[in-house]
Curated annotation (Swiss-Prot):
It holds the Pfam family CofH_C. It comes from the Bacteria. This is Aminodeoxyfutalosine synthase. InterPro entries: Aldolase_TIM (IPR013785), CofH/MnqC-like_C (IPR045567), Elp3/MiaA/NifB-like_rSAM (IPR006638), F420 (IPR034405), FO_synthase_su2 (IPR020050), MqnE (IPR022432), rSAM (IPR007197). NCBIfam families: CofH family radical SAM protein (TIGR00423), mena_SCO4494 (TIGR03700). Its cofactor is [4Fe-4S] cluster. It comes from Streptomyces coelicolor (strain ATCC BAA-471 / A3(2) / M145). Gene3D superfamilies: Aldolase class I (3.20.20.70).
Length: 387
């Protein structure tokens, strides 16, 4: 990128002018990560100061039985297959209550698209979880799951959301987005929920007063132009509804996915390494610069590793997710080398060591507690050469 284009993009960002598709592609083509990260950090600081948000949450994956066979997924199993499981609701409640003494604030629930579970299983599970943990927010179900519920129940998404909200739902999850462009999506997704239905369901959720996250799965067969298109679709929907709280880039776990036979899956598997740390940081930076109307950008440490997550905080991200606890969707792929859980103290140390001030939030991004910032005497900055 020549100096003139750099100055033009800097001026746009600093004046608050919206970046275009062409600008986004130009940013991805830049090989000056320090400049790109610095520009994204300016925007992140303007929106969120020196704060990094986190929460104390527990992920629940109540079934891995799924009708779909998406090319990127090692979580799903078919009915009767080895390692297929479906929890009784009582089991899920027991797992959730095991964290009761840790000031849990959120349950994050994502499942496979089970062909035989009745629709009533899902609102009942929310009601029983809410009854057991009334102070805990329930963030549950992807738009793909809501679309699946339409199929198995014969109900509309609007009526489904109404019943789930009545049962205690406070937010959808952001999954099922992957990459929206059909050029890529047709090769990686094996279900019927594409942009039209994904956006329809999140639009409905926003109309009903729910705030939701949105995601992008990157680092597989997509190109930078597909990432730019993905973010711009979300940005346009955010212009319309204002309902997205946070954008979450998710790094695809290449090395650990057990792909099945077939041309498409071999095409995915052909790239034997994950997106590099530098590519991950560039993705966070460009996302922060393009997605100007979303308040927060989250780095999900489970899918990036804690050191890359710390560096992402200096490249546009301002949220480090939470304690997580047993995220099967990634860890079922293989041992990715990240823990199943970080304690509150772990998160505080990681945030401070990256040079930021930790703030504990709830699902709605309401501040629960502010902590002191980094101690210069003990700060251990993340090392770029380890990314």
């Amino acid at each position: 990128m020549d100096a003139g284009l750099k100055r033009e993009l800097e001026q746009k960002v600093r004046s608050g002018e919206r970046l275009t598709r062409e600008d986004g592609i130009a940013l991805y083509e830049s090989d000056d990560l320090a400049w790109l990260g610095g520009l994204a950090h300016e925007v992140r600081t303007r929106k969120n100061g020196d704060v990094v948000h986190f929460n104390v949450n527990r992920h629940l994956n109540m079934t891995n039985v799924c009708t779909a066979s998406c090319a990127y997924c090692s979580f799903q199993r078919k009915p009767g297959e080895k390692d297929a499981y479906t929890m009784r609701i009582e089991e899920a409640v027991k797992l959730a209550k095991a964290m009761e003494g840790e000031n849990l604030t959120e349950l994050h629930i994502v499942n496979g698209l089970h062909p035989n579970l009745p629709w009533r299983y899902y609102p009942r599970s929310l009601r029983e979880l809410k009854a057991a943990l009334p102070e805990v927010s329930l963030k549950a179900f992807t738009a793909t799951e809501i679309h699946h519920f339409e199929t198995i129940s014969g109900m509309s998404a609007s009526d489904i959301l109404d019943e789930l909200i009545d049962a205690g739902l406070e937010s959808l999850t952001g999954g099922g987005a992957e990459i929206f462009d059909w050029e890529v999506r047709q090769h990686i997704v094996d279900h019927r929920t594409h942009w039209e239905d994904w956006s329809r369901i999140h639009r409905l959720a926003h109309e009903k007063g729910l705030k939701t996250p949105c995601t992008m799965l990157y680092g597989h067969i997509e190109e930078p132009r597909h990432r730019v298109d993905h973010v711009l679709r979300l940005r346009e929907l955010q212009d319309e509804t204002g309902g997205f709280q946070v954008f979450i880039p998710l790094r695809y776990q290449h090395d650990f996915v057990d792909m099945k036979d077939g041309k498409v899956r071999n095409r995915l598997q052909a790239r034997t390494q994950m997106a590099t740390g530098a590519e991950a940081l560039k993705t966070f930076a460009v996302s922060r610069l393009l997605f100007d109307n979303v308040p927060h950008v989250k780095v999900f440490w489970v899918m990036h590793g804690v050191q890359t997550a710390q560096l992402a905080l200096q490249h546009g991200a301002d949220d480090m997710d939470g304690s997580v606890v047993e995220y099967k969707i990634t860890h079922d792929a293989d041992d990715f080398g990240t823990p199943n859980k970080l304690t509150r103290e772990d998160l505080l140390d990681l945030i401070r060591d990256a040079g930021f001030r930790p703030v504990e939030r709830n699902t709605r991004y309401e501040i629960l507690r502010e902590y002191e910032g980094p101690d210069p005497a003990r700060r251990e900055s993340p090392q770029p050469m380890r990314v």
